[in-house]
Amino acid sequence: MIQTLTDLSALRALVNGWKREGLRVALVPTMGNLHAGHYSLVMLARQYADRVVSSVFVNPTQFGPNEDFARYPRTPEADLRGLEDAGCDALWLPDVDTMYPLGTALATPIHAPGVSDVLEGECRPGHFDGVCTVVARLFNQVQPDVAAFGKKDYQQLAVIRQMVADLAFPIEILGGSIVREADGLAMSSRNQYLSAEDRPISSTIRKVLLQMRDSYAAGTPRAQVEDAASHTLEQAGFRVDYAVVRLPDLSEPGDSHAGARVALIAARLGNTRLIDNLEF
């Protein structure tokens, strides 16, 4: 049966006990309102560790002033059942005082330069500082050997990898594949914000990503690929933050089309902001 912990000393005692037995420990950090994508990360982590801890903490420092912190969905009972079914061993439920003992205003910030400052970093200033700050604290609290993050948040994964490399965290970072609805929409806790009218339109993002891949692979200039993608999304009713092709490190590619690329989209449909990506 899954253990639920709200006390840091109890969490550390549990993890230290596992490690004394020679067991590898994985962490799957979440903000709750879990879905099949999150549970797939638990199952991925299980392949690389003997015990899996998942955390649920809606982190106030990664939400902007006009974002959805107050209304972010919280579904604790369903989360617990789903995590247990997925094979999670322990659920860590810190409160704000545990996570930020000096308060959020005095929290020591962590900034990952470069990769944090483009795309999502431009659209949501300070977002990745909040992500890095809370993830570093979770790493310190849980002391995992492995941690799993979803590739849907492609840039977040890149930011965390950079932070881990720079700060020498002895943690292996796993990237879990995007889990999609039947029509191709990437699973997200925010999908439930979509209206009944907008939900069928939302899968357009996946179709546009595939078009971007195919057009770019056929030799179409990058700027033309990006402009066409934005136009298609706008025609469908989206307000586009970005639709771009980048190198895997999120820098802008030159004129050559050789090598790995990733197409990334962020766009609003109604009141819902959706992000997705496609590696190719």
UniProtKB/Swiss-Prot annotation:
ATP binds at residues 31-38, 150-153, 179, 187-190. The active site is at H38. Keywords: ATP-binding, Cytoplasm, Ligase, Nucleotide-binding, Pantothenate biosynthesis. CDD domains: PanC. Beta-alanine binds at Q62. GO terms for molecular function: ATP binding; pantoate-beta-alanine ligase activity. GO terms for biological process: pantothenate biosynthetic process. Homodimer. The reaction proceeds by a bi uni uni bi ping pong mechanism. Belongs to the pantothenate synthetase family. This is Pantothenate synthetase. It comes from Xanthomonas axonopodis pv. citri (strain 306).
